[in-house]
Amino acid sequence: MKSGLLTCLVFACVVASAQSTPVGGVASEWDVRKLLESLDLQAQHVKPIIDQVKPQTWVAKGAPQAYVTQWTTAQAELKYLLASSESLSKEPERLTLALDTYFRMQALELTLASVTEGIRKYQNPALADLMQAVVSENGSNADKLRQYVQDLATQKEQEFQIADREAQRCRETLMKQPAAPIKGVRK
C-alpha cells in the first residue's frame, strides 16, 4: 500500500513538472505576450479606419443593409478580440483562451474583408486599400498565433497522455496489492 502511495506521489510530481516546463517548441510566456502586444497594436490601427466608415450613407447609394450589420459586427469583434487577447496575455498557458483569441481574430478578418469591399465600392477606394493593408500587416501575427495554438494543443495533449498513463499505472499497482487485513475489534 505504501509503495502505491509513493508511486502516486511521484506521479503528481511528474505531472506538476510537465505542466511548468514548456515542451518542444511551445513559445515562452514572454514571447506570447510580445505577440499579443503586437496583435493588439495592429488591432488598434484598425479602429480609426472602422470609425471613418459610414455604411448608413452607403444604403442611400444602393448598398445592401447587410453592410451596416457587418460594420457593427466588426466594431464588436474588435472589442472582443482585444478583451480575449488581454485575457490570454494574463494566462498564456490556457488553450481555451488561445483558441478564443485566434478564432476572434479570424472572425474579425473575415468581417473586415466584406466591409472593405463595401468601402471600396460605396465610400473610398483609398480607405479600402488602407484597411486591407492594415489587416494584411497582421498576417504574420496571425500565423504566429496559429502556430502557438497548435503547439499549445500538442503540449496539452502530451501532458494528458502522460497523466493518463501514470494514472493507469497507479491503478494497476494498487489493484495488485493485497487488501490490508481487517483488524478485529478488541473487547
How should these model regions be labeled?
Residues 1-8:
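Bacterial N-terminal signal peptides that target proteins for export
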